[in-house]
């Protein structure tokens, strides 16, 4: 392992009905005036009665609050700025997002803006840094992004539709209330997209250039991915299966709090590429990741085919014999894994064959939960000009490349996006 810091200050309150405790938690962490941040006005947060329950809990704890709604997927900087303006005027000292990653990231952005005196664009483009944010608590309703325990946020700058991130431990929420029952109403597509995002947060850490022994972190990561693999297939068919929903919710947090990347360098190239898809086409984040990853993997797997082979064996049960026959074992996903035709290439080594079979196994799993594995399946058809624009934006301000497993230039990114069509 390489040297690492692991910091997880977020208090987790997990289980049915825990949202009733939100007021006490805000008080315990020093809050007085709360800004509640959530999605669509008149949406499920309101119609389900959840917002009313949160209001009551805050009032019972003697807290005042102001609501800010209107968060959308691929959250916009303009709403963050509106929240900063309102928060300063109202004397807000505590932020309470109710929702998933987009809502939480919006709250993190508002916290940075209230606590500091700079333009948010400067923070997102890396021109300034800060270690100051307001205190944040979360009522989680979507298992996906893991922002409830992470240090990072991703926001869309409407000028140029650029998605950019910033991360610091000061933005890690003080607490997160996680009731799996609050995810029962999610559509199957959103559930599956969330599961793909959870998987990808660990996969981005699993495919690493670090060549020291990280076997302990590997086993943690592989166990999490197997659990998500299975729970997702249950949850899309049985939306009120508590155990499947609980597994996804907890896995979402563990997948993005640093645990599955401890002691090694993470990649995150696929995330950076998908951010450009989200910025240009406003696609669901997890679905966009699923649509791109297979092409990224086939483009870079020769860098370390053994890593992909291990992924296939440990996560999808791919066994490969000396004769290069691929057979899923009993621990494989529900749908049979069909090797890619490319594995018949006589110039491929057995490790190459296993690596390519692993990539196909991931795509088979994606299809089993109705996730796309190409841009066409995602429902978008970027032109070559649009692809070149996305590739250019992807490396903008990043020293001309993204990723660490195999650093990618804008030419590499364009090639991957063309492969993904």
Q: What does each of the following model-derived ranges do?
A:
Residues 1-94, 375:
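ATP/NTP phosphate-donor binding region
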Residues 20, 115-216, 310:
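A glycine/threonine-rich phosphate-anchoring loop and its flanking beta-alpha core
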Residues 35, 315-421:
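C-terminal charged capping/lid subdomain of soluble metabolic enzymes
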Residues 53, 81-84, 103-116, 149-150:
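Short Gly/Thr/Asp-enriched flexible loops that form oxyanion-binding sites at enzyme active sites
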Residues 92-110, 141-147, 280-283:
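Glycine/serine-rich anion-binding loops at beta->alpha junctions
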Residues 199-203, 245-256, 293, 362, ...:
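Short alpha-helical scaffolding segments that buttress acidic/His motifs in well-ordered protein cores
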Residues 209-361:
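Active-site segments that bind and position negatively charged phosphate/pyrophosphate groups
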């Amino acid at each position: 392992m390489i040297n690492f810091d692991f910091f997880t200050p977020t208090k987790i309150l997990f289980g049915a009905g825990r949202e009733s405790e939100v007021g006490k938690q805000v008080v315990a962490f020093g809050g007085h005036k709360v800004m509640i941040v959530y999605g669509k006005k008149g949406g499920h947060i309101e119609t389900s009665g959840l917002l009313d329950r949160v209001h009551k809990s805050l009032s019972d704890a003697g807290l005042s609050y102001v609501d800010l709604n209107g968060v959308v997927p691929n959250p916009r900087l303009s709403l963050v700025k509106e929240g900063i303006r309102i928060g300063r005027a109202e004397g807000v000292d505590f932020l309470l997002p109710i929702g998933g990653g987009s809502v939480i990231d919006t709250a993190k952005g508002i916290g940075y803006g209230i606590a500091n005196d700079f333009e948010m664009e400067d923070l997102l483009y890396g021109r300034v840094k800060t270690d100051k944010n307001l205190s944040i608590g979360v009522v989680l309703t979507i298992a996906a992004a893991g922002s409830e325990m992470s240090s990072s946020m991703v926001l869309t700058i409407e000028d140029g539709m650029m998605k950019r991130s910033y991360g610091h431990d000061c933005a890690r929420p003080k607490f997160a209330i996680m009731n799996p029952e609050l995810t029962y109403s999610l559509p199957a597509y959103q559930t599956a997209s969330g599961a793909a995002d959870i998987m990808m947060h660990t996969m981005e850490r699993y495919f690493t250039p670090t060549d020291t022994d990280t076997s302990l972190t590997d086993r943690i990561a592989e166990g999490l991915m197997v659990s998500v693999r299975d729970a997702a297939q249950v949850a899309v068919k049985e939306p009120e299966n508590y155990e499947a929903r609980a597994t996804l919710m907890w896995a979402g947090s563990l997948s993005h709090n640093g645990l599955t990347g401890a002691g090694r360098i993470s990649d995150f190239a696929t995330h950076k590429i998908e951010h450009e898809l989200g910025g240009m086409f406003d696609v669901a984040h997890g679905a966009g990741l699923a649509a791109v990853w297979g092409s990224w993997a086939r483009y870079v797997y020769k860098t370390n085919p053994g890593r992909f082979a291990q992924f296939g064996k440990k996560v999808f049960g791919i066994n490969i014999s000396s004769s290069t026959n691929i057979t899923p074992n009993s621990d494989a996903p529900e749908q049979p894994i069909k090797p890619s035709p490319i594995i018949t290439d006589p110039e491929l080594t057995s490790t190459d064959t296993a690596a390519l079979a692993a990539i196909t196994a991931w795509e088979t799993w994606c299809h089993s939960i109705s996730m796309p594995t190409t841009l066409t399946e995602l429902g978008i058809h970027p032109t070559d000009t649009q692809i070149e624009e996305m590739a250019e934006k992807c490396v903008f301000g990043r020293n001309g490349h993204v990723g660490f497993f195999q650093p990618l230039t804008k030419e590499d990114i364009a090639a991957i996006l063309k492969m993904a069509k």
